[in-house]
Regions:
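Short, charged low-complexity intrinsically disordered segments located at boundaries
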Residues: 49-56, 71-75, 106
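Terminal, low-structured helical/coil segments at or just beyond the last alpha-helical repeat
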Residues: 73-106
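Alpha-helical adaptor scaffolds
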Residues: 1-65
Length: 106
C-alpha cells in the first residue's frame, strides 16, 4: 500500500526504480487495482528508457491482469529489443507462449 502511494504521488524518474517496483508487484500482488498501478509504473519506465527489461515487465503485468492482447503486443516488442541488443529473450518467449495459451482458453 505504501509503495502504491509513493509511486503514484511522487514523480519518480529512474526507469530501474519504476521497473523494480512494477516487477515486485508482478511477483507478489494479485489485487487488480494495484496491478494497474504497477502497469502504469512499468509504462513510465519504458517512456524514460525503452529497453528489453522493462517491456518484459509490462508484458508480464498485462498478462497477469488478463489483458492478453496488449500483453502479447508488448512481449513481442520486448523480444525484438532483446534480439536487436543480443540479450537473452528466453523468458519472454515462454511468456508469449503462456499468453497465446490464455488467449485460446487453455
Amino acid at each position: 500500500k505504501q509503495a502504491v502511494a509513493f509511486f503514484n504521488n511522487y514523480r519518480v524518474t529512474d526507469p530501474l526504480a519504476l521497473n523494480n517496483a512494477a516487477w515486485n508487484f508482478f511477483l507478489h500482488v494479485d489485487n487488480k487495482k494495484h496491478l494497474e498501478s504497477a502497469i502504469k509504473w512499468g509504462k513510465q519506465s519504458v517512456a524514460i528508457e525503452n529497453a528489453y527489461y522493462n517491456n518484459d515487465t509490462v508484458a508480464s503485468l498485462l498478462y497477469k491482469a488478463e489483458k492478453h492482447g496488449e500483453a502479447l503486443k508488448i512481449a513481442n516488442k520486448a523480444l525484438r529489443i532483446a534480439e536487436e541488443n543480443g540479450e537473452d529473450g528466453t523468458e519472454t518467449e515462454k511468456l508469449i507462449q503462456m499468453i497465446k495459451k490464455a488467449q485460446n482458453g487453455n
